[in-house]
């Protein structure tokens, strides 16, 4: 970048530099970028022990996690030719349930040891984002995406994925 440009704005509020090209702006103009990120997280766990008899026991475990990340960014017209706004949300959820049943019995010279396990798991991922360019003013930023005139190719997308797993296991010893 041209080192002879001043380290402050001009009298009209603009930065010296090539303002009609993207990503060739005065590096100090990048301080005017509006960037916001919001993160929400919830994580819970529970465990329950049941003793039906001294020989028969059950353990139950469950957990739930939720994550959401919201991103918003506005590159003003002094940074990106005609400005650019981006908004996106990513969410994930995870649910796990686990059950374990044990039986241990001694009868004189005999010993029985049995185990039964079951687990269920589900995960969900979803999100969307959109990018808008060609703003006539920096007045709205990322708060009004309609103010931008163009949506670039592949500038908007959404997705959803859901996976599940169910498993069982058992063992017996004599």
Question: Where do the PLM segments sit?
Answer:
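Surface-exposed loop/interface segments of Gram-negative outer-membrane beta-barrel transport/assembly proteins
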Residues: 1-41, 59-167
């Amino acid at each position: 970048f041209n080192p002879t440009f001043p380290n402050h704005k001009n009298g009209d509020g603009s930065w010296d530099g090539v303002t009609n090209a993207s990503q060739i702006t005065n590096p100090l103009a990048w301080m005017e970028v509006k960037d916001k990120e919001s993160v929400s997280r919830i994580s819970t766990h529970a465990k329950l022990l049941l003793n039906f008899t001294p020989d028969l026991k059950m353990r139950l475990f469950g957990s739930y996690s939720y994550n959401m990340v919201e991103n918003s960014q506005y590159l003003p017209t002094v940074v990106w030719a005609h400005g650019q706004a981006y908004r996106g949300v990513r969410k994930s959820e995870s649910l796990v349930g686990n059950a374990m049943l044990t039986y241990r019995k001694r009868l004189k010279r005999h010993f029985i040891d049995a185990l039964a396990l079951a687990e269920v798991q589900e995960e969900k991922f979803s999100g969307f984002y959109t990018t808008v360019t060609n703003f006539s003013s920096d007045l709205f930023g990322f708060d009004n995406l309609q103010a931008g005139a163009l949506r670039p190719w592949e500038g908007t997308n959404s997705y959803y994925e859901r996976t599940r797993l169910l498993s069982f296991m058992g063992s017996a010893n004599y």
